[in-house]
Amino acid sequence: DVCSSDLDWDYDAPESAGAPTPRDASAGAMMASALLELSGLVAEPAATKYRNFALDVLRSLASPAYAAKAGANSHFLLMHSTGHLPADTEIDAAINYADYYYLEALLRCRALAELPASQ
């Protein structure tokens, strides 16, 4: 249930000696929020493309692969963020700004759903 971009910490990072690239829910949450904002500022068909991709990412973040169960994960909403891979710190961690941008993106989704159909 993970989208095609699969939320890598860096989309251009080379694979390291057989080790998988760490996932980064925070990057996905930030991207989804930004794309939802951008979808309201550009013309069609780009608006729909950005909105649909953001919604795919949010569905992925809401899946059991990234969403923590209530009370788990030190009470953070999202699991599997990467803070600073080059320094080998905050790998597969819960990061507060991941939750912030996730909630921001969800609020933007709600605002889009509340728009009149003509917009």
Where are these regions (language model features)?
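CBM-like carbohydrate-recognition segments
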Residues: 19-33, 38-119
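Short linear capping/connector segments at secondary-structure termini
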Residues: 6-17, 81-83
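Short, small-residue-biased leader/transition segments that mark boundaries at the very start
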Residues: 2-4
